[in-house]
Regions:
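Conserved catalytic-core segment of nucleotide-activated headgroup transferases in glycan assembly
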Residues: 1-61
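Catalytic binding pocket for nucleotide-activated donors in carbohydrate/polymer assembly enzymes
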Residues: 51, 69-70, 74, 78-162
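Short hydrophobic/charged patches on amphipathic alpha-helices used for structural packing
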Residues: 63-66
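C-terminal alpha-helical cap of glycosyltransferases
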Residues: 165-167
Length: 167
C-alpha cells in the first residue's frame, strides 16, 4: 500500500514504542487478506511493536468505517501522501489529525485542511516533530480533556471553516 510506506511504519512504530499505552488501529481494503495483515504486523514486530497493540481491519461499509473513529483518540497522517477524505472524516468525527508540512501537493493536503480549522497546532514541521508531538500527547495529563473538548466541537468548527466554504 503506497500510503503506508516503510517511513510511515517506522514513525508509527517509534510512537508506539515511546508511548507504551498507545495502540494503532489501521484499516485498508488490502488488509482483507490474512497474509497482508500478518505482513503489516511483521513489519511492526521488526521495529519492536507487539502484534497485540495493533488492530488491523479490512474493507468495511462506510457506516462501519465511521464507527471505527469512536475507538481512536488521535489520527496519524501518512506521508508523503496525506489523507484527504480520511482527514476530513476524522475531523468530522471529532478527531484531531497529526500531520506535517510536506514538500509536494500530495503531502500538504491534510495540513491545508487543519490550518483552516482550529487544528493548526497539530501540524508539525516534519516527520520527527510529528512523532514528538504524538509522544507528547500520549504523556500529557491534559490530553484526555483536550481531546474530549475537540470531540465535542470539531464537527461544528469544520462546518464553519474555510474548508467547507462553498462560496
Amino acid at each position: 500500500q503506497y500510503k503506508v510506506c516503510p517511513a510511515v511504519v517506522a514513525a508509527w512504530a517509534e510512537i508506539l514504542r515511546r508511548a507504551p499505552s498507545a495502540r494503532l488501529l489501521l484499516g485498508n481494503s488490502t488488509l482483507k487478506s490474512i497474509h497482508n495483515r500478518q505482513y503489516v504486523a511483521d513489519q511492526f514486530a521488526i521495529l519492536g511493536v507487539e502484534q497485540d497493540r495493533l488492530t488491523l481491519f479490512g474493507p468495511a461499509d462506510h457506516y462501519r468505517f465511521l464507527q471505527y473513529y469512536d475507538q481512536i483518540d488521535v489520527a496519524l497522517d501518512t506521508f508523503p501522501y496525506n489523507g484527504g477524505t480520511t482527514t476530513m472524516e476524522a475531523i468530522w468525527q471529532g478527531l484531531p489529525v497529526l500531520t506535517f508540512d510536506g514538500d509536494r501537493w500530495a503531502s500538504r493536503t491534510s495540513q491545508s485542511l487543519l490550518r483552516r480549522t482550529v487544528l493548526e497546532s497539530f501540524v508539525a514541521g516534519d516527520a520527527r516533530a510529528m512523532v514528538e508531538m504524538a509522544v507528547g500527547l500520549a504523556h500529557d495529563p491534559s490530553t484526555p480533556e483536550t481531546l474530549a473538548r475537540l470531540r465535542r466541537s470539531l464537527r461544528q468548527e469544520l462546518a464553519a471553516s474555510e474548508a467547507c466554504d462553498t462560496a
